[in-house]
Amino acid sequence: MAATDFVQEMRAVGERLLLKLQRLPQAEPVEIVAFSVIILFTATVLLLLLIACSCCCTHCCCPERRGRKVQVQPTPP
């Protein structure tokens, strides 16, 4: 039941976004700037999330290869 509520909520958000985009050419400059800032912020957050996930997956899946261990021999006195 929670999944259907989530899908309906996402659909409603998408419809509101589409309505905003359709009304954007007639909007006032302040509304255009505010909408652009919100879109830019959302895109930045998604990009940073993508970069963080890719860096994490790279370190988890492909651990750094270390060189061969060299045994240290004691020096004679």
From Swiss-Prot:
List cellular component terms (GO). Answer: membrane
| Membrane topology category | Single-pass membrane protein
In terms of InterPro entries, this protein maps to: SMIM5 (IPR047133), SMIM5/18/22 (IPR031671)
Q: Where does it live in the cell?
A: Membrane
Membrane as UniProt keyword: yes
| Key word Transmembrane present | yes
* Primary location class: membrane
The residues that cross the membrane are 32-52
Keywords noted in UniProt: Membrane, Transmembrane, Transmembrane helix
The name this protein goes by in its record: Small integral membrane protein 5
Q: Which organism is it from?
A: Homo sapiens (Human)
